[in-house]
Amino acid sequence: MPPPAPGARLRLLAAAALAGLAVISRGLLSQSLEFNSPADNYTVCEGDNATLSCFIDEHVTRVAWLNRSNILYAGNDRWTSDPRVRLLINTPEEFSILITEVGLGDEGLYTCSFQTRHQPYTTQVYLIVHVPARIVNISSPVTVNEGGNVNLLCLAVGRPEPTVTWRQLRDGFTSEGEILEISDIQRGQAGEYECVTHNGVNSAPDSRRVLVTVNYPPTITDVTSARTALGRAALLRCEAMAVPPADFQWYKDDRLLSSGTAEGLKVQTERTRSMLLFANVSARHYGNYTCRAANRLGASSASMRLLRPGSLENSAPRPPGLLALLSALGWLWWRM
């Protein structure tokens, strides 16, 4: 193979103006527009600037930058109508152009073509545009009844192809992929779910959240009975968990109670609990009370007592069958 013609040695420098990256071509030129080696790759992030430079010498008579088959610059002559592409340097040693605010449409093959006194030569660089991952669509907030199914969708775009991960913020549960399927959902699975996407282009991933609300019927979690003397204040308390929040009602025997001076009591209800307040306990107030918590999915009830001090009755209701069990144990002890 004959040695390369004078001036045939070329380096192609591709530099990111913002990132300060540089790529230098690997060797000698291909002759007569025949490319015997693959083009160098030059990667830049969307929105950054890219500088493409040909390093030449005094033997070069004509030089041009092309994108695919379109001439961008031939010497000082501008051929492109894109205002983002401009001539940066044109000297006997260097011919450089600048592309500002690089977009996906700029990705592709760029060719530096020049003419020496003997023949034409070219070298190439392939511009790769990376796009940070971002979420373009995500499910709206979801409300479902306990036992139902939920599908959450999170669509992300970016180059390279981004990963998508779903995470439940309450317990850290994670799932890979754009779609998160939850079958037979339970109340403990309610809360915020976060979609996170990343492709390594930016240090910070993109993330968005979806609130999942699980409806379920009331469950009474705590009750408080009282043992109070005549003329003193007393309080009975009932707590229930439910979504939507439960509506509370109080009963004495089978009679629905309400706040009022005639009854001598007051019903005070907050989000998850209700209290029956007695400002001045009288004899007619003693007895059994029932708290009922209900929403559109169901209801739950619990009993409690307001007792006199010194009463032999236990203020806490005993489980069914406990009295019978105690009686049987006492009879066995007496027989021994």
From Swiss-Prot:
It comes from the Eukaryota. Disulfide bonds join 54-112, 154-195, 238-291. Glycans are attached at residues 41, 49, 67, 137, 288. InterPro entries: Ig-like_dom, Ig-like_dom_sf, Ig-like_fold, Ig_sub, Ig_sub2, Ig_V-set, IgLON_domain. Gene3D superfamilies: Immunoglobulins. It is found in: Secreted. Keywords: Disulfide bond, Glycoprotein, Immunoglobulin domain, Repeat, Secreted, Signal. SMART domains: IG, IGc2. One of its GO terms (biological process) is neuromuscular process controlling balance. Residues 33-122, 132-217, 218-307 form the Ig-like C2-type domain. It holds the Pfam family V-set. The keyword Cell inner membrane does not apply. Residues 1-30 form the signal peptide. GO terms for cellular component: extracellular region. Belongs to the immunoglobulin superfamily. IgLON family. This is IgLON family member 5. It comes from Homo sapiens.
